[in-house]
């Protein structure tokens, strides 16, 4: 397998199907950001796996994150595919799977009414970093839509839920590790319908 092609030396790449585009094309920006999100998640997975205490407490979440990496690659593949060239890989089942995970975890969390400032533990903060990186990916995907480029709308739903998942898992991580959340002191009550 040849890693370098020299094709990108002039600032261009190819989408699925062969269309030549600039490396600053909205699709390339979106799937490049997806790759960043997936890579950052790999750091979290490795850190949990390598720390016996973390793996004991967060092993299930680590396994979920490994599955999420697979789903992120499906999302990236769909983003690299101009609309209609092939069937999309990401499905509504991926969205439902994330919702089921959150529905399982949210009842375990203490009542939350205000904004949370990332902290409490390094791992919780890493999940909040995942949340914000995922929101960045979501904005890049919206830019693809605004550029009149067709995308898998299920992928956008998935990324929206994924950010929520990382928020929930960040809070759950602090709970499981015995750390308190840092509440934004000037926050109005915003989660009125939460547990």
Task: List each language-model region with its residue ranges.
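Phosphate/pyrophosphate-binding loop motifs in nucleotide- or prenyl diphosphate-using proteins
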Residues: 1-195
